[in-house]
């Protein structure tokens, strides 16, 4: 406890700017083996091939892996690493994992085809979005089974380990960075104006055998725009409501330094981000901001004990209004109502209406009352003008400490380390919720011009002044580890290491009864001979309360080997080869990640959610219904994997490369396989099931990743070019659900895990004769099909098109695109640096359905019409139509998953371009500014894709943006 108090006091001293810990000594450097390997020496070169062009100096030689840091030359594959602190010198970023898929092979939004990953910050489970790039030293992506084994069950799908910055043994440094930029929208949805909507809605009614709803005169008046208050034409994306752009700015100060006894680091940051909304209360409540403070200190108490204390706090406030503007923009039709009622157009002598004006709390700009109708008594515009505002508050505090004991006095090479972390997060919404009245105008033009003859009022104005608290959320993380480490070299060449550890964490959340837990023991034994031959055994003994007693613990072993063949006699004298190493790993990792909840092994009865029954009319009673059977033999699902790796450098580090191939199986996923049991064990009504959850479904994943880097000085320009890529395939190798399918093409076994199934379209029905001569589709449409509806292929030739005719259409890329590519280019001339980064995603498809695009593409009933309906089917356009006929009913036949709505998500994005200039030292003189630089950059500048218009489209949410930024940085 005394040590913790000392550490906290030292952190506070640093934050207050005390120079007591400064040192005039030169900057501390981690020693590394020479990069210029001679053929007479067995020293191993630096490895720029380790997956990122930014890993090219000696400081980067140590890589954070599970519970330790190792020389990157000694990595055994399945690990990618990015030096964020060095990358930020030429690539300013705003998010911790920004463009990571273009820098770390194997990462494609997830890792090696899996659906999630564990994020660790300094070894503890934390949110990636709560640590900024300016705070990060290094990001390690642990992909292979051997790399993640020590973390146990929760790491079975991979680990992204974020290492934050720390101080060093050097005189105090103060780094300041400031940025300011603007965001501009890429694209907005395009909806029809009032007149066009009304015209096409009339057409939809005629298609349904109904009469027109809107008269020709009404359509003309809406089209003319002569009186937008009487004949509204709402455009949510006009400059009346939105700005052309919004700004973002940030400021970061870093203070670091220390000596051989104590080292410290402090990061103080602030950012603020705006919004496009620019009217009503949104104009003053459209910003979010965040203040953060991070500090750590490393203290060498004596020759045996070292201590570290880390703490961070963040304070986020997001201001907004009490409505969903973007959601309403996708649903509110343009002619529905007028947002504002002009007071100037009130008829003279209309005293009742004038009383409304005089008594209103909300006269907008002194000229307007809030508009609405009986059906729109609360609406998005009135809510923004008068409904009040809110603040979303998020506060996080994170604390961790660790102590290291050098036990070489007991046994040479022995050490002990223990860590403890306690994190708190709380969030809630503070809101002022106001009530307001809206008014519907009654119009006349008997005077020869439009005027309001009367107002109908709906609702009342009221302000309580009370601040309402809602959406409260609380989370607590507690993590602990303790480990014995052994590291010793025998006879100069025999390097032996081992780790015995205990590791665990639990995450408690508000309104969640069971905490998220991870607990395991770990054992690692490693050996390498002269950095030529490697062997590593990593294992975990895990525990999970989600399994039945007797099956809650399991052993997860892995084995990795490596061979640096460039040190063998047959390659040692090949001057073109600087370094060449091959690796292999295999293992079994037990996991409870995909066990959705607790007690699945235990059957249960339900009462509250059961069916009703009664022996007497008017008196209903719940039954007791069984929902699942017992399975006390349930075991852990397992990740079984073998992977192979290669890495090397050629031609004196002109070329660096790495690659991994992986073959992984997830065996024993837990499902309730209704179709595998007799039908009498389950019923649909009342809902009853005696079928247990069992280990049955199996998945497969296989693929490869690679990196290829080139470094060359051409004249006065230093060039670095890097390519990264990840390709993976998935397969449902066993599915209990397949027994419900009648035909082979329906079955999920053998298909990708992200398989999209749907019908195959065959154009449109051209007329009634075409319908009569085609397979029956009446089961797809409750009212039957009509000319202009989509025609589908009858896959099983039974004369009926139904869900049994759905086939495999493509991969959804839900865990990341099947093929992810990244390219980065750096050119440095004197003090000027150019950097560009691009990402490519290929091989996936998506549906233009309501899940992604609301009713933008699937338009029927009372939906708002988008520009896609201009290609609708009519008798005149039947040969060139690109969209089904319009209807005011429910278009069950047309709006279902089929290849008609399928599109490719293949794309290449120019994600970043930055030009940086470092001012020469002679320009700065001998003042207090030691270094000064400036840069300009652009984010998300260009997308090249066949379906770019769709890929850049957001429906029902704020638009995607491009960001242009100017930044400066200085060292004091």
Q: Which residues does each PLM region occupy?
A:
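Conserved small-residue
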Residues: 175-230, 323-324, 328-332, 598, ...
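Glycine-rich, aromatic-lined ligand/substrate-binding cores of catalytic
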Residues: 814-847
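C-terminal extracellular loops and terminal segments
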Residues: 690-700, 740-757, 809-822, 826, ...
């Amino acid at each position: 406890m005394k040590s913790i108090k000392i550490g906290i006091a030292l952190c506070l001293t640093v934050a207050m700017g005390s120079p007591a810990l400064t040192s005039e000594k030169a900057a501390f450097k981690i020693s590394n083996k020479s990069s210029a390997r001679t053929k007479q020496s067995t020293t191993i070169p630096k490895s720029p091939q380790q997956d990122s062009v930014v890993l090219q100096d000696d400081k980067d030689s140590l890589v954070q892996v599970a519970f330790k840091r190792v020389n990157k030359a000694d990595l055994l594959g399945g690990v990618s690493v990015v030096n964020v602190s060095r990358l930020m010198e030429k690539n300013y970023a705003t998010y911790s994992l920004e463009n990571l898929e273009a820098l770390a092979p194997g990462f494609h939004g997830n890792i090696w085809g899996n659906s999630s990953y564990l994020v660790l910050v300094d070894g503890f489970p934390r949110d990636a979005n709560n640590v900024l790039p300016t705070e990060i030293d290094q990001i390690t992506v642990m992909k292979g089974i051997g790399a993640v084994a020590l973390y146990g069950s929760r790491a079975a799908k991979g680990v992204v380990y974020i290492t934050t910055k720390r101080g060093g043994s050097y005189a105090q440094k103060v780094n300041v960075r400031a940025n300011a930029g603007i965001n501009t929208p890429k694209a907005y949805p395009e909806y029809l104006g009032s007149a066009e909507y009304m015209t096409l809605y009339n057409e939809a009614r005629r298609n349904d055998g109904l009469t027109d709803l809107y008269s020709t005169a009404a359509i003309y008046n809406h089209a003319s725009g002569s009186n937008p208050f009487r004949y509204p034409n709402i455009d949510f994306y006009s400059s009346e409501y939105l700005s052309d752009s919004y700004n973002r700015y940030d400021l970061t100060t870093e203070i670091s330094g220390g000596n051989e006894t104590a080292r410290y680091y402090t990061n103080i940051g602030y950012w603020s981000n705006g919004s496009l909304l620019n009217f009503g209360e949104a104009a003053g409540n459209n910003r979010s901001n965040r203040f953060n403070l991070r500090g750590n200190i490393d203290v060498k108490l004596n020759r045996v004990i070292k201590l570290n204390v880390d703490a961070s706090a963040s304070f986020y406030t997001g201001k907004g209004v009490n409505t969903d503007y973007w959601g309403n923009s996708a649903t509110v039709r343009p002619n529905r109502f007028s947002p504002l009622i002009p007071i100037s157009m009130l008829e003279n002598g209309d005293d009742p209406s004038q009383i409304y004006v005089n008594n209103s709390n909300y006269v907008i700009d002194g000229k307007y009352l809030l508009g609405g109708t009986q059906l729109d008594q609360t609406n998005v515009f009135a809510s923004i003008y008068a409904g009040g505002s809110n603040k979303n508050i998020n506060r996080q505090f994170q604390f961790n400490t660790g102590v290291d004991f050098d036990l070489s006095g007991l046994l040479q090479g022995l050490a002990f380390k223990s860590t403890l972390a306690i994190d708190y997060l709380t969030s809630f919404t503070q809101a002022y919720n106001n009530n307001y009245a809206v008014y519907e105008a009654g119009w006349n033009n008997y005077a020869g011009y439009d005027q309001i003859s009367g107002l109908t009022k709906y609702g009342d104005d009221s302000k309580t002044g009370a601040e309402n608290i809602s959406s409260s959320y609380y989370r607590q993380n507690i993590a602990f580890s303790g480990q014995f480490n052994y590291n010793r070299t025998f006879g100069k060449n025999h390097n032996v290491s081992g780790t015995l550890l205990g590791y665990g964490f639990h995450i408690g959340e508000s309104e969640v009864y069971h905490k998220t837990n991870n607990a395991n023991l770990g054992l690692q034994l490693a050996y390498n001979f002269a950095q030529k031959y490697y062997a590593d055994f990593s294992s975990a003994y895990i525990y999970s309360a989600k399994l039945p007693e007797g099956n809650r613990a399991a052993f997860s072993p892995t084995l990795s080997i490596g061979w640096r063949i460039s040190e063998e006699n047959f390659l040692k004298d090949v001057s073109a080869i600087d370094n060449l190493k091959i690796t292999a790993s295999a293992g079994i990792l037990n996991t409870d990640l995909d066990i959705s909840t607790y007690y699945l092994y235990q059957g249960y009865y339900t009462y509250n959610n059961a069916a009703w029954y009664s022996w007497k009319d008017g008196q209903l009673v719940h039954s007791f219904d069984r929902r699942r059977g017992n399975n006390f033999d349930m075991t852990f699902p397992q990740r079984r994997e073998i992977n192979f790796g290669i890495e090397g450098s050629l031609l004196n580090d002109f070329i660096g490369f790495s690659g991994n191939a992986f073959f992984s199986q997830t065996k024993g996923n837990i499902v309730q396989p209704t179709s595998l049991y007799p039908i009498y064990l389950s019923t649909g009504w009342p809902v009853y099931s005696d079928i247990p959850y069992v280990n049955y479904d199996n998945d497969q994943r296989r693929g490869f990743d690679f990196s290829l880097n080139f470094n060359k000085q051409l004249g006065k320009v230093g060039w670095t070019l890097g390519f990264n890529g990840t390709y993976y395939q998935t397969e449902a190798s066993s599915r209990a659900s397949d027994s419900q399918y009648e035909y082979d093409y329906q079955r999920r076994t053998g298909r990708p895990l992200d398989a999209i199934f749907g019908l195959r379209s065959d154009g449109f029905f051209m007329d009634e004769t075409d319908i009569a001569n085609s397979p029956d589709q009446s089961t797809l449409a409750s009212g039957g099909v009509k000319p202009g509806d989509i025609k589908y292929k009858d896959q099983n030739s039974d004369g009926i098109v139904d869900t049994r005719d759905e086939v495999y259409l493509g991969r959804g890329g839900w865990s990341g695109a099947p093929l992810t590519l990244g390219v980065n280019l750096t050119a440095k001339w004197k003090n000027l640096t150019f950097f560009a980064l691009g990402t490519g995603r290929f091989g996936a498809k998506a549906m233009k359905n309501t899940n992604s695009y609301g009713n933008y593409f699937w338009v029927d009933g009372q939906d708002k019409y988008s520009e896609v309906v201009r290609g609708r089917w009519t008798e005149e356009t039947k040969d060139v139509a690109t969209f089904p006929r319009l209807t005011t009913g429910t278009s069950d036949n047309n709006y279902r998953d089929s290849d008609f709505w399928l599109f490719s998500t293949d794309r290449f994005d120019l994600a970043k371009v930055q030009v940086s200039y470092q001012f020469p030292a002679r320009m700065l003189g001998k003042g207090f500014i030691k270094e000064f630089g400036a840069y300009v950059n652009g984010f998300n500048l260009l997308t090249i894709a066949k379906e770019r218009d769709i890929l850049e489209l957001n429906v029902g949410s704020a638009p995607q943006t491009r960001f242009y930024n100017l930044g400066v940085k200085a060292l004091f």
